[in-house]
Amino acid sequence: ENRHHRENLEDIVRTRTLALQQALEWLERTEKELRLSREETIQRLAIAAEFRDSATAQHVQRMSHYCELLARKAGLSPERCDLIRTASPMHDIGKIGTPDHVLLKPGKFTDEEFGVIAQHAEIGYRILSGSDAELLKVAAVIAYTHHERFDGTGYPRGLKGETIPIEGRIAA
């Protein structure tokens, strides 16, 4: 009777183990699909934001790739590098708030026009900030600081050196 009971228990364990393995495989596939969907959505929204400015998908992909490489070179964790890679395509999302007559103007901007175009960093920050999601927090920082310069001549705040968040220094 003990033998029979043990065999029944072993059958139950095998069945449940198989069910758990299948559930785990399903979760892994679903998680991968969600991650890919999130990244593709971000890429497509970034392309849409830059569409009026003749930006291409290749620009967004290059930006993402170079930011990841620079983050790695800076010694950031693999998780942080991936976060920066995923968030960086949103750097110019604020351009959706820039009027066409300025954004699409050929040639050099007047001081006034430059002031208008420079607002895209703050607009992007306002669009992306306020989320609890780490990805959007990083994207907001990148949007706000990707035109800052190490010597303090950048915009919108004229930050200098180490006061520029690492994500912004990488994206610049």
What is each stretch, according to the model?
Residues 29-172:
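Histidine- and acidic-residue-rich, metal-dependent catalytic cores
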Residues 2, 6-9, 13-16, 20-23, ...:
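Heptad-repeat alpha-helical coiled-coil signal-transmission segments
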